[in-house]
């Protein structure tokens, strides 16, 4: 549910927070992790993934033109939850620590959401994750860095093997951003197909793109078309808002032929224009609802459930019984191998996209399922999703 809905009719206790997501090359992950520990950030999750860029090289034997292929690089995706008034200070600290203002170092963004946490333990002790000290960044603003405001996150959850690489190629050809690809396991439509389920593999590729908000729907329509998402079982795509962020603009790897790279020029213009509106290209696609096959349902919600490893199935079943169409579950881990309660830090995160009309019912079902055990669910996060698409809609 949205912030307004939660305030008007809250079924359980909640708090408004910011989710900061940062993906960097795996060689930077240790340094960034140490800094997050120093900051005192709570609920930090790490997920392995890969970034995709274009590698351009001259053709051999002096032939004209260039050879272009995709280059994968290992990455770590950090997710931290902080108070909303601390979010930008933490982001600037992370940017300065990992030098994310330099092209090729990584991407960072924050999203505003409503968080439901599990209640206090039955023995009367408080939940340490709720009483953790506030984050205390030492840098309130990275020098020469201006966060972009007009951004959106596009999440594509794909069923077919190799489709993640295909959509990453499309995103790079469009010059949107550096795609980040992670893995997950799907539950929902496939389980209802009977014998036809063998045609839809359970493993999913999750492609995430941080793009200018002005072009988000136009890019979504192109991805739907290129990924054949109008066919059943191929996957789905949805959009969520980004409050602030900094995008990695190094889409291509190759020899630099000029005094400044195109990535440096784009970053400089973004700073001068104080946003990405000047990049808008898909003027006629954003509001095009004439093609019924590509109609984007409005007013949706993304529900994320973070739980102890092995417990996601119970929660997903409760969500499906409450009306959710399915879920995608990924394996993540806490920042340390043992969390502050002495439990193993392995976690599962299930992502569920639902219409706003049933969001409250699904959240209530999840909280009810988690009530039977103190350690089944760490928290539930609810985020607005202004546009979504799946074949079943």
How does the language model describe each region?
Residues 2-393:
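Positively charged, small/polar-rich N-terminal and surface patches that mediate targeting and assembly
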């Amino acid at each position: 549910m949205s912030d307004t809905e939660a305030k008007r009719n809250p079924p359980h206790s909640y708090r408004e927070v910011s989710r900061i997501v940062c993906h960097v090359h795996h060689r930077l992950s240790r340094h960034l992790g140490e800094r997050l520990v120093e900051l005192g950030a709570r609920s930090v999750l790490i997920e392995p993934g890969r970034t995709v860029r274009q590698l351009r090289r001259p053709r051999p034997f002096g032939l004209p033109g260039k050879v272009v292929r995709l280059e994968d690089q290992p990455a770590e995706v950090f997710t931290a939850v902080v108070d909303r008034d601390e979010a930008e200070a933490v982001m600037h600290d992370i940017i300065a620590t990992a030098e994310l203002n330099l092209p090729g170092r990584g991407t960072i963004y924050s999203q505003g959401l409503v968080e439901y946490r599990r209640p206090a333990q039955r023995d009367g002790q408080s939940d340490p994750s709720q009483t953790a000290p506030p984050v205390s960044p030492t840098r309130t603003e990275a020098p020469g860095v201006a966060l972009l405001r007009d951004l959106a996150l596009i999440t594509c959850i794909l069923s077919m093997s190799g489709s993640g690489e295909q959509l990453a190629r499309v995103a790079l050809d469009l010059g949107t951003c550096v795609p980040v690809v992670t893995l997950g396991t799907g539950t929902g439509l496939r389980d209802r197909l009977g014998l036809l389920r063998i045609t839809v593999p359970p493993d999913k590729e999750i492609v995430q793109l941080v793009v200018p908000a002005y072009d988000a729907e136009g890019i979504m329509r192109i991805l739907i078309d290129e990924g054949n998402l109008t066919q059943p079982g191929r996957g789905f795509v949805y959009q969520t808002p980004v409050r602030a962020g900094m995008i990695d603009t190094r889409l291509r790897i190759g020899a630099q032929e000029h005094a400044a790279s195109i990535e440096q020029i784009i970053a400089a213009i973004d700073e001068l224009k104080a946003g990405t509106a000047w990049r808008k290209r898909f003027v006629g696609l954003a509001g095009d609802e004439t093609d019924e096959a590509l109609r984007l349902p409005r007013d949706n919600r993304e529900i994320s459930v973070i739980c102890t490893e092995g417990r996601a199935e119970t929660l997903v079943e409760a969500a499906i019984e409450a009306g959710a169409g399915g879920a995608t579950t990924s394996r993540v881990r806490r920042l340390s191998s043992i969390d502050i309660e002495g439990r193993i830090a392995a976690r599962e995160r299930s992502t569920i996209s639902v219409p706003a009309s049933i969001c409250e019912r699904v959240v209530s079902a999840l909280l009810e399922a988690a009530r039977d055990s103190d350690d089944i669910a760490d928290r539930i996060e609810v985020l607005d999703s202004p546009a979504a698409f799946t074949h079943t809609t």
